[in-house]
Amino acid sequence: MAKAFENLEIWWVTGAQLLYGGETVKIVDGHSQEMVDGLNASGIIPIKVVYKGTVNSSDEVEAVMKASNNDAKCIGIITWMHTFSPAKMWIKGLQALQKPLLHFHTQYNAEIPWDTMDMDFMNLNQSAHGDIEFGHICTRMRVARKVVCGYWKTEAAQQKIAVWARVAAGVADAHNVRCLMFGMNMNNVAVTDGDRVEFEQRLGYHVDYYPVSSMMDYWKKVTDKEVDELVETYKQEYTIKIDESGEEVYWQKVRNAARAEIALRRVLKDEGATAFTTNFDDLGDADINDPNFAGFDQIPGLASQRLMAEGIGFGAEGDWKTACLYRTLWVIQQGMPTGCSFLEDYTLNFAGDRSSCLQSHMLEVCPLIAVDKPKLEVHFLGIGIRKQQTARLVFTSKVGRGIKATVVDLGNRFRLISQEVECIEPKPMPNLPVASALWVPQPTFEIGAGAWILAGGTHHSAFSYDITEEYWEDFAEMLGLEHVRINKDTTIPQLKQDLRNNEVYYMLNKALR
């Protein structure tokens, strides 16, 4: 079990009623426990499922739902109707529920026992009946949920539950995320800005400004011994490559990057933050030409890269939405093999049906997506208030399918946009000393890039090789977000119509609740 999931639980609640007698309820109880044990033993669902009993009345339903709200370990509820469970008894409980809901339409037995089946068997095994009744009341009440249909022992059904469970963990974590902005948004940039109050109300993330000058108190307390130890870690984890900067400048800048990382880690820990942003125009007020200068000589790119690999959300140029979304993505895909990163659309390569977009940034791309051991290099970065030589990890990404996602503020709502991409191998770029990925947007460059632009997408995104569109669909469902999906089946005319339809729906949506 991934560390991020160790103390989490999913509660399984079975629906029934007392119409069929107490012995029937005992059988339902036994079957339910066996099914929960089977899911836990499968090794597919990464979060422990806990059987919380069979509910037979409105009071019992309401009690377990309220208990789930008040238990921090519980990140979601799975419901299943073994017998018929009249849905009016679920109303108060569903009204009270504040955790994600998965409705599992399954059955204890896989097949009908044709030769022995009688009415007792029919009354006991009424999922076909009870789940439809439960589904109706959820739809009538506009309850957001995921519906999984299939036999509980099959890998296909278990995988869908696993997707939902991972996303529920990400949503639970989102409500505990504090994102620190070291400096504000880059001036005059629209897409990285937005309503931070509504963002917290809708998605749970809390975003605060934190002065770079306050971080300098931490900076000054970092010892040379601590810097030496971290530099030794760099030597073990990365390939040391000294280029035009020369050895003296190289190690000076690497040590400065190490000091920045130590200070930044301590601020985040003391402030209880799991995401942050930087801005190259706000690096503190110290004079870099002062012989006794102490502070950021450039943006803390190496620190950002390493912190992302450990699950700290990051957004460049004050992009707090992407910083928070990256944190959630990292939580969701804990234990998966291939990696995730903050990325930015940088430059295009027109090559017919393999036209692509180079993803990079000035410094901050996560080494989790590196195809080979990253190189630790020092080069000049001529942007922002301090144009200096600075340390960074340089690598190219793995090849393979992936998905990028972003959240944008449209004024009256937040929109989640996801897009399938194919990462391909770039040609050598000997004069570009930054980490990068090269991808072909799906379904084609022309349609995929056009769809992203029409949807109002950002130039920053949270990217993953390991998750799929289904994860982001569940995320949007849990948080009540609009989700625009761009994939192999996307066409521009249909996308335009969907966007127009969504404008109307989301204006009227609040009246339905």
What are these regions (language model features)?
Residues A4-I27, N176-N185:
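Short beta-strand segments enriched in small/hydrophobic residues
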Residues K26-S42:
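Short catalytic helix/loop segments, enriched in acidic residues and glycine
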Residues P46-K48, H105, A110-S245, V249:
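Cap/lid and interdomain-hinge subdomains that line or gate substrate/regulatory clefts
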Residues V61-I75, I91-G93, E261-D270:
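Short, well-structured alpha-helical segments in soluble
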Residues H82, K99, H105, P113-M117, ...:
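Anaerobic metallocofactor- and corrinoid-dependent redox/one-carbon enzyme cores
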